Every structure is written in structure tokens, then in C-alpha cells.
Amino acid sequence: MNTEKLQKAREFEQEQMKKISSEERPFYHVTGSVGWINDPNGFSYYKDEYHLFYQYHPYSNQWGPMHWGHLTSKDFISWKRLPVIMAPEESYDNAGCFSGSAIEMEDGRHLLMYTGVGIVKGAGVNENGDPVTHQTQCMAVGDGTDYVKYEKNPVITGNDVPEGGSKVDFRDPKIWKEEDGFYYSVITNMTEDGNSRILLYRSKDGFKWEYVTVIDHSDEKLGKMWECPDFYEVDGKQILVVSPMAMLPEGLKFHVGHSVIYLTGSYDKTTHTFVREDVQPLDSGIDFYAPQSMLTPDGRRVMIAWMQAWPNSKFVPDGVKFFGQMTVPREINYRNGKLIQQPVRELENYRGERVLHENVEITEETTLEGIRGRVLDMTVKLNVTDELKSFTIKAAADEKYASFISYDAKKEVLTIDRSRSGYLYDILHSRDIQVSPVDGKVTLRILMDRFSMEIFINDGSQTATMVIFTPQEADEITFQAEGKAEISIEKYDLIF
């Protein structure tokens, strides 16, 4: 049903999209139709297509009252833009339709579950001068194009939060269905002492929900508010993914501020007990937040994330007509105690001619025939020997601009550095990552698009993601070593 606010957003979106050329967008990373985007939402399979919704403020390239944007794809790579599907207009979501998820119902409808942020009438303003709001969980149903909010929203309110929890910070439902016939949802909730916990709810019909238990909690460790939870099993291991705010650093494992971590363990579906065994970073780069996953019809767990970070997102480059993009969708597996991430295999269908260099000795800055470009899929295998001190890849480069991927062989530290990439703000521009060789090698699969680099380290056992704003003419790639390096390179331009 096209309400007045929704219709206004759709008309604005269609008009402003005409002002953005394809040359201004990345080739294969999702962007919003116009305006601002952040968290991926409603990542699901419905009517023979993959659906991706997203947090969306169409009216500017800054964060604002959240709508839901919408795209579909047959292969995770080429996406079709559909009209915005939700606008903040009801009493329970007039301050924003916040993040949520989606699932197909048995009757064929597409069910969306999201957080409504509503202004509390008569409550005045908070310490920041903003209206006092509360967060509740809401439903909408649709046919893949148009969606209608459930007439009895909200379906879970602050009254359904167990003792000790906040009614203000209660959001980001992730829905799925179990073999027992129930829909389940994990929802994050801040506790009165400023920590976070992940609550589990269930419903027989998708609309009437009951509280079940606490899945896990931060307990004054691993940050404060755990945003955007995801909960699933992969390769026999139960995974809880959260995006903590106010994270404290721990060596090179966890970095300060907003992060994404995954907790591994076991889960008893009868007692709904999750026993945590380990905690690891999900991505160790600069720009990665709020991932959401889905299960494909062929049984793959596929994840996508907002390719940005909240501290950096406040600094929007001058002249851009939209802001925010998503990572390439990643296949997730569990092996040797870690989540393994790789770009979805469908990306290989877009590869052009193969360029191969094997066992190349590098001692000084070197260019190699056929190795340059900005839209590519390149794997570099570095032999780590006693003769190697450090090795550097310089990409998206010319005389003025460059981004760097460097490896210190003695410290076993990989560094990504975009300080010369053209992102001209005093924000985080580099990150150090502990990376040990595997069988004497460090392997880097590098995905480049017009405005980003995604690095899959040692067959995806670690990843590092960063956004760059470098003129497209800067397309040189060079290799340099201190000491002596031996590398092999396989590179494909990506053709669209």
C-alpha cells in the first residue's frame, strides 16, 4: 500500500536516480538508489530471487529517518533496483524503520521483521536534545515488490523485555524458522548497567511472539551494545555474530570502537542454551559493520555487510550524490576453528582473461605485464623465507594516489593503508593485522572495485575491508620488497 510518505519517497528516488550515472557507481558492490545507506536488511531468498533491503535515507547523503530500500538479484552480483518499500510514518516507527530481517512464509508471503523507533508523546527530549523514543519490533508482509505493515504492530514491546533491560535500546531482529515449526528471532537489548544481551523470542505464526531466553551477553567485556545479531549453524558449529559498540582493544586481535565479532559454541535447540567456546574478529579492516546472512536454496551460508564504519561515515566526500555501499556477498564455512569467508562463487562468472605470473623474484619496486586496473580479482601468493623482511603491494596508484597492503615477515603483521587514497579526512586510514604464514606462504585474494578493496587472507581465514575514494585514472599496481620476495600472481579483470 503506497501511503503518502512512501509515495513521496518513491517519487523522489526515481527523480534523483536519473542524476547519477553508472560511471559514478561501483561495478559490483551494492549502493543505494540515492542518498544514504547503512545496514543490510531482509537478506533472503524469495520467488526465485535474492532480496536485499537496506537502511536508507533517500533525501540526503547523511544519516536521517530510516526507510527501507530494496534490490533483487539472480546471482548476488548483478542487482535490480526496486522502489523503496517502507517509510517512517506510524506512531510506532515515526522516528525510523530500523534494521530487521525477512523470511518466506508457508503461505507464500514475504515476512519482514524490523525495529520501529517511535517518539514517546509528552516525554520531551533527551540529554542530546532529541525527542525521547522507544524501540519495538514490528512486522510487514508483501509480495516481493509492495509491503504492508501489520495492522497490530508492534508485536514485541518493552513490556516483553525481561527484567533489567532497556526499552530504548531494543532492536535489530534476525528471524529464521526451525524444524519444530516455530519462527525464532534474536534481538539485541541493552541492560540497565550499560551492557548488552541477545534475547531469543519465538512465534508459531510469525505475529504473536513470546520471550524464550538470553542467548549470550557482553558482561562488561567485548564492547557495550551488541548491534545486529545473527545466529546460525554452519558446518556443525553454532555461530553468534554481533557488532559491538565501544569495543576495547586487545593487541591486534580486537580494535577499539565499533567492531564485528563472532562467538562460536554449541547450541541445544531443546533447552535453547548456547555455550560459548571462542570469540574472533569477523573482519579486521577499516570499513565493515552490521553483517547479515542467509541460507541459499543450495545450502550455502552467504553473508553481506555494510562496507563502512560509523566513525568514518560522518565524513562524506565532497560532491558525492550517494553514500554507502555493501561488501561483496561472502560464502561462510567453518574450518580449523575459524569462519572461512570467500566471495560468492558467482563472481567468477564475470572474470575476463587470466593473467598469470609464477615464481617472480621481487627485490625493488616492480611492475608486471598485465597487472593493473581498478575492477579486478587478483590472488597473490607470497613465499615467506628468511631472506624476506617486508613486502608491499601498491594499488589504485599513480604519482599522487595509492593504497598499500604490506607484510612484515619478521613481525608477521599485515598492514592496510589508505592514507594516500584520496579520502581527505582525519579519520582512521590504516590497520595492523596479525597474520601467520600457512605452509610457508601468505596468500592474499584482493577484490578491487572503483571505491573499495576487500582482502581475503590465507584462503579466507581472515579478511580486511576498506573503502577508497581514488580517481579512476589511478590504476597502477606495483610490488616491492625489502630483502627478497618470491611471489605468484593470478589476476582477472572483472567484466560487466
Listing of model-derived features with the role each one plays in the protein:
Residues 10-16, 264-496:
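Beta-rich accessory regions
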Residues 1-172, 177-221, 235-284, 307-357, ...:
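Beta-rich carbohydrate-recognition and catalytic domains
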